[in-house]
C-alpha cells in the first residue's frame, strides 16, 4: 500500500539530537564505495543539508522510520554557534513541519461541522477518536467547544502527526517514580458551518500536553499518567518539569531543568541572574525515622527572598515544593551520612519557571487549564481540588479570542503562537484542504555540556569557540517520495532508502547495473558516484524491509 510521507524538517543544533532509539546488537552491513566520505559531505559548511533522503511510494512503515532516523541523525552532525555569555550560549532552534491534510468538501459534503486532531505522534491523534468517529472529550469540554459528543453525525478526523511537535520519551528521568512513561502534544479544532461559511468560534481550538503510560497511545483511564512534581512534559515545543500543582491558588508551576541531583546540607546552587538555591538545613525526625525536616532558601544577590521548611521522605514520600519568580525547587528525598553529621537532599531546581494560572490568559486569547482524564475522556478545569490532582494528566491552553469568520483559501489561524491551521483550495472549485502547520523558532540558553529538548530535537552545547558570534541556521534534510525526485534532475546528493521493489530510484540503478540488490541481499550500503545528475547516491537497502532497517541502523552507527 502506498504511503504518504510528510516532510521532516526538525533542525538539530549544537551537538546531539536524539533520533529514534536503536535496538541493541546492530548487524554489520555490506558496504560498497566510500560511505564515510559520502556522509562527511552530508552537511555544507553553512549548516544546510547537502543531501535529500528518498523513500519509496510503496514503502513499508519500517522503511519510513529508517528514513526519518537518518534525517534526524544527519541533522545532529551540524553545530550551531550562539551569542556567548560567560560559559553559556543562546542557541536558536527552528523547525518546519506539517500534518496530513483533508479536503473539507469531501469530508463533509452536507455542511456538517468537523473536528480535527493532530499530535506529536500520529497514534496519539488516532487514539483520541472512538469507534463512532467522535473525539474523546467530556460533555463539559464539548459544550460550546470542541464538539457535541452526543451527535452521531459529527465526524472527527485525525490529521496524523506534526513531526516537530514535542514528545518526551521519559517523563521521569531521575526515576523518582520508577517509570519510563511518555508525554506528547495534541491539538484539536472544531470547524463549523455558519450560514454556509466556515468559522471557528471561541473555545473551539485546544492545545494540550498529556502524559501517557510507556508505549500506550489510546486515550483512556488505563493509559494516562497522573502528573507529579519532577515529571517532564512538553509545553509549546519545549521540555518543562512539573514543580508544583497548587489546588489552593489554582496554579500549575513548570520550569526548565537547571539542576537534577544531590546537594549537601549548607550547599548552594547558582541558578543564574543572581539567584541561588541553598539547602540551609536537614534535620532528622527521630532516631529511626526516614523523614527529614528540610529548610530551603532562594536567594537573590545574596539575600534570602523566599524560604520554606517542610517534611521530606518517610512512608508518605513527602516532597518539598517551592516556587519564586523564575526559580522552582522540588526536594524529593533526604538522608544523612553514616556518621549522622551531614545531610543530603535529592533536588530538582528549575529556571525560567512559569506559573500557569488556571482560567487566566497565559498568552493573549489563550487560557490555561488543567487537563484531566474523566472516564476515558479529556476534561479541562480551571478550578481544581485536592481530589482532582489524582486525575490531572496534563495541561491545556484553550482559545478564547474572537470568532474566526468566513474561512477560506490562504487563511491561517494561529494556535498559541506555536502552530497554524492553514487553508488551501489548490485553485480548484471543489477543493478546500486544511492542515496543521509549524514554522517555529525558539531560543534556549545552555551551559557547556548541558542539553535541552526543544521542537522535538535534543540539543546539547558541546563547546564555545572564542569567536562564536555568528548565528547559523541548520536544517535537517527533507525526506521525499521517489515520485518527487528524479535521478536526471537531482540538485544534490541522494540517500535512497529501500530496495528495488519499493523504491523506484533504487530500481533504476539496479536495472542500469550500477548497484546489485535483489530480494536475497543482506543489509547493504552502496555509494554510486555521479548517478544523480552528477551527484552521488547512497543506497540503504536489503533484500527485505528487515534487512533495509539493519542497513539504516548500520549507517547511523557509522555517523
UniProtKB/Swiss-Prot annotation:
Assigned GO CC terms: extracellular region; S-layer
One GO term of the biological process aspect: cell wall organization
Residues of the signal peptide: 1-28
Glycosylation sites: 108, 130, 155, 222, 373
Location in the cell: Secreted, Cell wall, S-layer
Keyword Phosphoprotein listed: no
Role of this protein: S-layer protein. The S-layer is a paracrystalline mono-layered assembly of proteins which coat the surface of the cell.
Record-given protein name: S-layer protein
Species in which this protein is naturally found: Methanothermococcus thermolithotrophicus (Methanococcus thermolithotrophicus)
Organism classification: Archaea, Methanobacteriati, Methanobacteriota, Methanomada group, Methanococci
